Amino acid sequence: MLKSEFHYDLPQNLIAQSPLPERSASRLLCLDGATGALEDKSFRDIEKLLRPGDLLVFNDTRVLPARLFGRKETGGAVEILLERLLGERLMLAHVRASKAPRPGTWLALEAEHRVRVVERDGDLFLLELAGEEPLQTVLEQIGHMPLPPYITRPDTSADLERYQTVYATRPGAVAAPTAGLHFDTELLGRLRGAGIDMARVTLHVGAGTFQPVRTENLEDHRMHAEYCEVGPEVVKAVERARGRGGRVVAVGTTSMRSLETAASGGSLRTFSGETRLFIKPGFRFNCVDALVTNFHLPESTLLVLVCAFAGHRETLAAYRHAIAQAYRFFSYGDAMFVTPNEPAANR
């Protein structure tokens, strides 16, 4: 399929610039991929959409304050966006400046911290932090929350809490797994009380999640690599849900990609390593039965994923409905509850 087949026009005023006062107060558009039927609901209605014995799978990655500001030796301003931690003082990062810094040069950061440009690797730079403090500590001191590029306001202290899920425990992401932002502790407690099981995978979301498909033909697109982990407790939880007739509900595209990476052989197994899984129409789903997800950018790999799961025509019709009904889009926006166009292969 072609990238242009996943385009839609979105009014700029529908791009949410800030979160709602309450996490679970968002709207929820339900899409039945088998029929194309749509229902407008509140996110709190997810309690009624889930059944006892269902399994919610969350991504427990924690977003690092991964945006740094500084200056080159010549005085020019630079902006650094961490892509991945490679060690206590090494990172792979995007560097935005009027002119790309050369290997061997130093970049001055806030609070008298400095990083040295070690080498360039395509669009990314290998940077080394000077001194003895671990990079993660320095990020916590002077880093800014890496809000997506379509959020045009400066980050604030409120984003340190709201651009983070309430269950985030494993630092490493530079973008939030945004479907999880709608769950607050009260809602999670009610779901547990209703007999909904829960499990956690880890996928450290990279900045590449915001990159568009760069080739017209989807088959030619190469996905960015992200670290993910599916532990034995997740495998057991899925087996338990299957045994009780429950569904595996992925909270977010990152949870779905983690599960389907680990189930690529046909059945779910433990997994730890990099994934470049690009889920597109024609993909054989082996694990996930339903998906909670936000609305995604036109021509993005994430929109392609939802189309693969719920159907291309059905998904784009749902997006047109969401626009007509003034849903809020993207990271701080509203959500969808999606059931598949076809059931998972192993059901």
Swiss-Prot record:
Query: Which GO biological process entries does UniProt record here?
Result: queuosine biosynthetic process; tRNA wobble guanine modification
Q: What is its main location?
A: cytoplasm
Q: What are the subcellular locations of this protein?
A: Cytoplasm
Q: What is the catalytic activity of this protein?
A: 7-aminomethyl-7-carbaguanosine(34) in tRNA + S-adenosyl-L-methionine = epoxyqueuosine(34) in tRNA + adenine + L-methionine + 2 H(+)
Q: Which InterPro entries match?
A: QueA, QueA_dom1, QueA_dom2, QueA_sf
Which keywords are on file for this protein? Cytoplasm, Queuosine biosynthesis, S-adenosyl-L-methionine, Transferase
Pathway(s) annotated for this protein in UniProt:
tRNA modification; tRNA-queuosine biosynthesis
Could you state a single Gene Ontology molecular function term? S-adenosylmethionine:tRNA ribosyltransferase-isomerase activity
UniProt signal peptide: none
This entry's Enzyme Commission designation comes to 2.4.99.17
Mind telling me which GO cellular component terms the entry cites?
cytoplasm
HAMAP family, A to Z: QueA
Q: How does it assemble?
A: Monomer.
Physiological role? Transfers and isomerizes the ribose moiety from AdoMet to the 7-aminomethyl group of 7-deazaguanine (preQ1-tRNA) to give epoxyqueuosine (oQ-tRNA).
The family line of this record is:
Belongs to the QueA family.
| Name of the protein described by the UniProt record | S-adenosylmethionine:tRNA ribosyltransferase-isomerase
What's the source species' lineage?
A: Bacteria, Pseudomonadati, Pseudomonadota, Gammaproteobacteria, Methylococcales
Name of the encoding gene = queA
